[in-house]
Amino acid sequence: MAHPHLLAERISRLSSSLEKGLYERSHAIRLCLLAALSGESVFLLGPPGIAKSLIARRLKFAFQNARAFEYLMTRFSTPEEVFGPLSIQALKDEGRYERLTSGYLPEAEIVFLDEIWKAGPAILNTLLTAINERQFRNGAHVEKIPMRLLVAASNELPEADSSLEALYDRMLIRLWLDKVQDKANFRSMLTSQQDENDNPVPDALQVTDEEYERWQKEIGEITLPDHVFELIFMLRQQLDKLPDAPYVSDRRWKKAIRLLQASAFFSGRSAVAPVDLILLKDCLWYDAQSLNLIQQQIDVLMTGHAWQQQGMLTRLGAIVQRHLQLQQQQSDKTALTVIRLGGIFSRRQQYQLPVNVTASTLTLLLQKPLKLHDMEVVHISFERSALEQWLSKGGEIRGKLNGIGFAQKLNLEVDSTQHLVVRDVSLQGSTLALPGSSAEGLPGEIKQQLEELESDWRKQHALFSEQQKCLFIPGDWLGRIEASLQDVGAQIRQAQQC
């Protein structure tokens, strides 16, 4: 692949030209362009009058000398209106059944079929062959067709278990469009004087036939790394477990991989990256319910696994637990000793916290773990004010077990050595101790593990920063991934400061 970054820049400029004068349609244009550049089909779902046909017409200008065909299907549409009329002369003179295809679908690079589900069986069967094999049987001859992009549109989905499902499955990219929402965009659309049929693409950006053919071969050379395959397989397994997940055929998975390869290729990369998998959100859904489900599952994949976010948090949790264990080993030295107050005539002994204990929230370590409220507890977090109240006046005391959840009622007492002791239901006790002072710093073992974890985090963040320059991925998805990585980084830095 020669000059990959120059190619990525060119495709970005080409897309920007195609998007001119279209409002809130950037994502649709970009995915239709990606589909056209990789020879795939697109289904646009949405109400009438939202520029579905204009999107298809614009894509014609992405290619030099491209021919376009568009047709509005009705229940009475005939194959002649889509594939061309019969040649009366050929039938009369030579007895040949042959269509005159000039100006019709078999000779067009860009095809737009509106109200696609109203097509009859004769049209649908021929269309399936055209999509699958890029061939058209014209009488006794089988002719190759130059179709690079089929855009089908409707304001409804095909009925389940109908004869239309086979065609629907061939439409790899599925986009649900709506009216222009933003006020400023709506005003600009109303006042725009641009002729929608003008060619907005400079000649230098248009794709030649030679480039298109060469790119098809080079797209197939883009590799699928093992770690990206594992993410895809994880998504597939998760969908198989969900009762409401849509059925995704092996054919659709395979075609989706080629789309991911094309995304990587036109982004200047030699391999598919995790960020490309976001495109699957527009490939795997079937209806409104599955659209939301697919997006949720891919969001979990991207923000939890694609850059090892969950794995790094699991490692961090293990390091924190190990740190607490090391601190527990030193708990005898740091056992919290409260101060006994005077009050000879007091009916209850009163205590107070040492003056050097000033934190608003105290995390106290158990000298030995206890099972409290059905949980193995190694440390308890107290609000300082609540603990001072209990030391002074007694009554009920609550704390967060292992620092999580709601504060739970505890059986806490002060022993004869003025140490705090917490007891379980069997009255086994464990002395509470202060964590090691920050002045001592982190143990070498913990410090090294955190440094290694931070190094791995930096590598993953750098990978994401490098891969996120992808024209075909919406910015809000990239923002959520960045936020998930920053959250992991913040937790690592917080642990390093303990």
Swiss-Prot record:
- What Gene Ontology molecular function terms does this protein carry? ATP binding; ATP hydrolysis activity
Where is this protein primarily located? Answer: cytoplasm
Chain sites annotated for binding ADP: Y23, G49, I50, A51, K52, S53, L54, E196
Xref: Pfam families: AAA_lid_8 (PF17868), ATPase_RavA_C (PF12592), bpMoxR (PF20030), LARA_dom (PF20265)
Q: Does the keyword Nucleotide-binding apply?
A: yes
Its cellular-component GO annotations read: cytoplasm
Q: Where in the cell is it found?
A: Cytoplasm
Please give the CDD domains that the UniProt record associates with this protein: AAA
User: Catalyses which reaction?
Assistant: ATP + H2O = ADP + phosphate + H(+)
On the tree of life, the source organism's domain of life is Bacteria
Q: How does it assemble?
A: Homohexamer. Interacts with ViaA.
By sequence similarity, the record places it as follows: Belongs to the RavA family.
Name the NCBIfam families for this protein. PRK13531.1
Quote the function comment for this protein.
Component of the RavA-ViaA chaperone complex, which may act on the membrane to optimize the function of some of the respiratory chains. RavA functions as an ATPase.
Q: What is the name listed in the Swiss-Prot or TrEMBL entry for this protein? A: Regulatory ATPase RavA
Q: Which gene encodes it?
A: ravA
